[in-house]
């Protein structure tokens, strides 16, 4: 039995197949311990280590003990990482014996045992030298630091995801987020190992607006909206696959987390991001909304949680996401939906009167208010008025932190939060102001242009729908 494990989870019986291991000129390996393809041909693989970093091969696992590390005469390994010896950023973290993968002969469970002082991580959690962790299908294996992901562990008999998805993508168990419909998982495209986000939606859950069953056609609406969009500040969609009660949307991976986390980061002392950084982000969001409205799309749920950061840097590219409530603005919009503290007065009134894309401008004003100040413009914490009353009257309270924000910026926020829609600016009007022509906005524009590059994962994808009948495909 394997001792010192950090977790135990139920797992079906699975098998170590190894690819031929070449000798590293500077790190000799004991060839007696290196199993070639012919030696393990009789053993059926119980699992695979899928290489997701450039230069690292995938490894079939069929034996009960498999060792990974740099290797040496006194520390033989089955896989010695010689393929990435020139990848200094990774190779410097690899120990002679980094980790081993062991199959318990009694329980048939699979464990990763960490042998390295630099550390081995599973799902971005450090195991610790001398400790073990049970491996489950889709687990991520990293070396040294969370960002250095090298393998995805795939069980041979795993059936968690449909073949229509797994034949094109490696789906990990690493969660990027959860919502009312399902979850978002980290994935990799098999053709080029490019990283993607896979949004798994349970079509038996209710929709956020109508509380009705979320039919495939409801999700198709979101997909159809996203298909029309191509902008560096908007998350791209690559693929859509629907099988039985689940739909899978394969979208652009954005690794910096939610913008909300940045806004409330303790390093800003709940005082907001300030004038310079706030305007840097304001330009990006206004540009994204300007584009959406120019192609006839109203988002209807703009909030910090639906804005993603490209990375953890202080100045990063923002990406607008979650188009579940988006609608073609040519069609009539009357539904009360969205998030209460970011909803425009005309939505809150809910009098059955049509509203316009200017509801997005109001929501943007709310986002920028909290961006500059660190607190929301409308809140249930104000006990003198209900949330709806605050919104319907446009009551704003400017606390002390606004003293470091220019009057010009304060006036722009007030303009966006004008109760009467006809007096509220459009995205075109906002972008045309002198406020958007400052040095920080010019820097933002330059950074956006630098970020534009071909996305390999966006190579021709197909919409796939598998229900009662055969798979139907349509070019995106």
UniProtKB/Swiss-Prot annotation:
It catalyses: L-seryl-[protein] + ATP = O-phospho-L-seryl-[protein] + ADP + H(+); L-threonyl-[protein] + ATP = O-phospho-L-threonyl-[protein] + ADP + H(+). GO terms for molecular function: ATP binding; metal ion binding; protein serine kinase activity; protein serine/threonine kinase activity. GO terms for cellular component: cytoplasm; nucleus. Its main location: nucleus. The keyword Membrane does not apply. Its cofactor is Mg(2+). The active site is at residue 301. It is an enzyme of class 2 (transferase). InterPro entries: FHA_dom, Kinase-like_dom_sf, Prot_kinase_dom, Protein_kinase_ATP_BS, Ser/Thr_kinase_AS, SMAD_FHA_dom_sf. Highly expressed in germline tissue. Its EC number is 2.7.11.1. Keywords: ATP-binding, Cell cycle, Cell division, DNA damage, DNA repair, Kinase, Magnesium, Metal-binding, Mitosis, Nucleotide-binding, Nucleus, Phosphoprotein, Serine/threonine-protein kinase, Transferase. Pfam families: FHA, Pkinase. SMART domains: S_TKc (SM00220). It comes from the Eukaryota. It is found in: Nucleus. CDD domains: FHA_CHK2 (cd22666), STKc_Chk2 (cd14084). Residues 66-127 form the FHA domain. Serine/threonine-protein kinase which is required for checkpoint-mediated cell cycle arrest, activation of DNA repair and apoptosis in response to the presence of DNA double-strand breaks. May also negatively regulate cell cycle progression during unperturbed cell cycles. Phosphorylates and inhibits cdc25 phosphatase, preventing entry into mitosis. Required for nuclear reorganization and homologous chromosome pairing during meiotic prophase. This is Serine/threonine-protein kinase chk-2. It comes from Caenorhabditis elegans. The gene is chk-2.
């Amino acid at each position: 039995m394997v001792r010192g494990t950090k977790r135990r989870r139920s797992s079906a019986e699975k098998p170590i197949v190894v690819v031929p291991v070449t000798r590293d000129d500077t790190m000799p390996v004991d060839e007696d311990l290196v199993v070639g393809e012919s030696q393990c041909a009789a053993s059926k693989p119980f699992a695979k280590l899928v290489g997701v970093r450039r230069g690292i091969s995938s490894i079939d696992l069929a034996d009960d003990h498999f060792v990974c590390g740099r290797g040496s005469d006194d520390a033989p390994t089955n896989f010695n990482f010689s393929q990435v010896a020139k990848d200094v950023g990774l190779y410097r973290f690899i120990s002679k014996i980094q980790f081993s993968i062991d199959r318990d002969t009694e329980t048939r469970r699979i464990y990763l045992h960490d042998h390295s002082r630099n550390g081995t991580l599973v799902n971005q959690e450090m195991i610790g030298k001398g400790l073990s962790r049970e491996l489950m299908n889709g687990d991520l294996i990293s070396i040294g630091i969370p960002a250095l992901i090298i393998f995805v562990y795939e069980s041979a008999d795993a059936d968690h995801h449909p073949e229509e998805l797994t034949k094109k993508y490696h789906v990990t168990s690493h969660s990027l987020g959860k919502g009312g419909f399902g979850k978002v998982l980290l994935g990799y495209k098999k053709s080029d190992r490019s990283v993607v986000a896979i949004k798994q939606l349970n079509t038996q859950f209710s929709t956020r607006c109508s509380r009705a069953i979320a039919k495939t056609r409801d999700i198709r609406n979101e997909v159809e909206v996203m298909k029309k969009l191509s902008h560096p500040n908007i998350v791209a969609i690559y693929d859509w696959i629907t099988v039985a009660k689940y739909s899978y949307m394969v979208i652009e991976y954005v690794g910096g987390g939610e913008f909300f986390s940045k806004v409330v980061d303790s390093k800003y002392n709940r005082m907001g991001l300030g004038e310079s950084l706030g305007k840097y982000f304001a330009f990006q969001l206004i540009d994204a909304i300007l584009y959406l409205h120019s192609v006839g799309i109203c988002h209807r749920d703009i909030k910090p949680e639906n804005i993603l950061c490209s990375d953890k840097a202080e100045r990063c590219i923002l990406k607008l996401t979650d188009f579940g409530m988006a609608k073609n603005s040519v069609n009539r919009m009357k539904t009360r939906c969205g998030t209460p503290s970011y909803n425009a007065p005309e939505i809150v009134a809910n009098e059955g009167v049509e509203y316009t894309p200017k509801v997005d401008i109001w929501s943007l004003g709310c986002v920028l208010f909290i961006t500059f100040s660190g607190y929301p413009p409308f809140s249930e914490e104000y006990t003198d008025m209900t949330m709806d009353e605050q919104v319907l009257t446009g009551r704003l309270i400017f606390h002390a932190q606004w003293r470091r924000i220019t009057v010009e910026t304060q006036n722009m926020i007030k303009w966006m939060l004008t109760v009467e829609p006809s007096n509220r600016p459009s995205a075109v009007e906002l972008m045309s102001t002198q406020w958007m022509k400052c040095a920080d906005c010019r820097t933002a524009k330059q950074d956006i242009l630098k970020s534009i590059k071909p996305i390999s994962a966006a190579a021709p994808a197909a919409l796939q729908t598998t229900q009662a009948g055969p798979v139907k495909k349509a070019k995106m």
